[in-house]
């Protein structure tokens, strides 16, 4: 008989090959969001580069054991981490995301929130929150709850959207509660009991185009609800000189993260924090 991951007591093994919650919650995320992302993740420069930065960050700050990718959507990040040699459990409350993750071949998928799963206190070695925290109404309480689930010395890895001035209709549609600065993310992590080990901005070249092409049109009421076509256009890389410039910019940024350097501007924040080990 299979044992649920993380000592979870609120899960049952479903007929579709993944763990499911015995009860379900309401999500701050559009019902079709996972399917929209699934259709463009593999061809998106943004998702690909974020994965590369996450993998590099885990190499610099290795997890002490299995990483639980909380709110991990379709398993794009979890699949990349597994391929890079980091054992990963996907924890995704959306049914479509869990099913898409299974299609990607992930071995351990949990269709539940962390509360629904009932993970045991001090049981998780590492947690990933990749563009998840901005969806949570009370981010401090959520981080504190995750802190209680982690073993001393465990690490949490995060990405979040940056700068409230870059707010647009995409944030509204995605169910975001806020965007962060380095200082605000560091503050909430510390208040939750974590020691921040690394915190940088990333996608350093995107704030200006996002401001001009998303934020301003949204303020003026010109920006429409994102759809498959608009999302594909924004996430695809162009050929020629423009594509070369984007790839150079991404490569430069990746090299800085590999050396643990801090970037002072970007459309996202990338962070690593640790639950303080027991003294002695």
Language model: regions and residue ranges:
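A SAM-dependent methyltransferase catalytic signature shared across enzymes that methylate proteins
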Residues: 186-200, 247-252, 274
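Short, glycine-/aromatic-enriched active-site segment of Class I SAM-dependent methyltransferases
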Residues: 38-40, 156-190
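A structural helix-start
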Residues: 136-140, 160
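A short glycine-rich, Lys/Arg-flanked "PGG" loop and its adjoining helix->strand segment in the class I
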Residues: 140-155
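Conserved catalytic loop of SAM-dependent methyltransferase domains
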Residues: 36, 76, 198-250, 264-268
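Short conserved AdoMet
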Residues: 62, 137, 151, 194
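Conserved N-terminal segment of class I S-adenosyl-L-methionine
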Residues: 1-122, 126-130, 140-143, 240, ...
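A short His-aromatic
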Residues: 131, 135
């Amino acid at each position: 008989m299979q044992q649920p991951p993380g000592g979870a007591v609120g899960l049952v093994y479903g007929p579709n090959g993944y763990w499911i919650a015995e009860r379900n919650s309401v999500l701050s995320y559009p019902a079709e969001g996972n399917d929209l992302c699934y259709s463009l993740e593999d061809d998106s420069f943004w998702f690909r580069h974020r994965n590369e930065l996450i993998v590099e960050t885990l190499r610099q700050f290795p997890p002490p054991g299995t990483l639980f990718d909380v709110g991990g959507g379709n398993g794009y990040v979890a699949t990349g981490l597994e391929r890079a040699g980091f054992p990963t459990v996907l924890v995704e409350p959306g049914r479509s995301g869990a099913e898409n993750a299974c299609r990607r071949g992930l071995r351990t998928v949990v269709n539940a929130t962390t509360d629904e799963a009932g993970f045991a206190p001090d049981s998780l070695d590492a947690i990933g929150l990749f563009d998840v925290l901005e969806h949570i109404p009370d981010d401090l309480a959520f981080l504190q709850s995750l802190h209680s689930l982690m073993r001393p010395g465990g690490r949490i890895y995060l990405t979040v959207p940056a700068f409230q001035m870059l707010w647009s209709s995409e944030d509204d549609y995605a169910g975001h509660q806020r965007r962060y600065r380095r200082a605000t993310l560091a503050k909430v992590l510390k208040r939750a009991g974590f020691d921040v080990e690394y915190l940088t901005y990333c996608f350093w070249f995107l704030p200006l185009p996002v401001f001009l092409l998303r934020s301003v049109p949204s303020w003026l009421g010109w920006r429409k609800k994102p759809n498959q076509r608009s999302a594909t256009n924004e996430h695809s890389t162009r050929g020629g000189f423009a594509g070369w410039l984007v790839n150079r910019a991404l490569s430069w940024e990746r090299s800085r993260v590999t050396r643990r350097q801090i970037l002072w501007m970007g459309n996202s924040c990338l962070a690593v924090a640790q639950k303080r080990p027991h003294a002695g």
